[in-house]
Amino acid sequence: MKNKILVKNNELTVDISAFDDKDEVLSLQRKNFNLILGKDSFLRGFDANLIGQKSLPLYEFSMVIPSDFKDEKLRGKTLDFKVHNKAKIKVNSETNLDKEKIKSLEKELANQKEKNALLLLDNVKLKSEKEKIIKDFKDEIKTFENRAREKIAEKLNLEKQLLENKFEDFKKYGSQKIFESIMPIIQNLLVAIE
């Protein structure tokens, strides 16, 4: 156990004691507890107090109990912990990466970075194409609106001209009818005057 540093996925068998001031918190007491570092299987944030420490038979630290802890009385309290390491560290295979696996992962990471760069480039191209399509569509709408306005203006001018012509015809016809209706009266007056 000497000179080993605790890392994620190390497996420890521990006894855990928790204290609120000097009073032991029995609900957090564990005996022969199998603790896989990084999983936070005992308490959220607990493992972070052990990861990076040298392998020792006893660890002592304080931590604040998470605000979503099941026991409402303990939420937000700072408790003192004693963790007795009872067995040798089991090193899970995930922590023993050999050089070939590291190279493979580095290559995979490089490939993924290249794919991400290509996807980013494609996204930029797609965005540019999308912007061009939107601009072209807006231009077509403006052209259509202008043509529609011209057609409407032509139609209105034609209708206006037709109405003006009808009005002139009506004025001529109306004047003629009025003249025809008063003509007998004028003739009678002329006859009466003579």
Curated annotation (Swiss-Prot):
The keyword Chaperone applies. One of its GO terms (molecular function) is peptidyl-prolyl cis-trans isomerase activity. Keywords: Chaperone, Cytoplasm, Stress response. Its main location: cytoplasm. SUPFAM superfamilies: Coiled-coil domain of nucleotide exchange factor GrpE, FKBP-like. InterPro entries: GrpE_coiled_coil (IPR013805), PPIase_dom_sf (IPR046357). One of its GO terms (cellular component) is cytoplasm. It is found in: Cytoplasm. Participates actively in the response to hyperosmotic and heat shock by preventing the aggregation of stress-denatured proteins, in association with DnaK and GrpE. It is the nucleotide exchange factor for DnaK and may function as a thermosensor. Unfolded proteins bind initially to DnaJ; upon interaction with the DnaJ-bound protein, DnaK hydrolyzes its bound ATP, resulting in the formation of a stable complex. GrpE releases ADP from DnaK; ATP binding to DnaK triggers the release of the substrate protein, thus completing the reaction cycle. Homodimer. Belongs to the GrpE family. This is Protein GrpE.
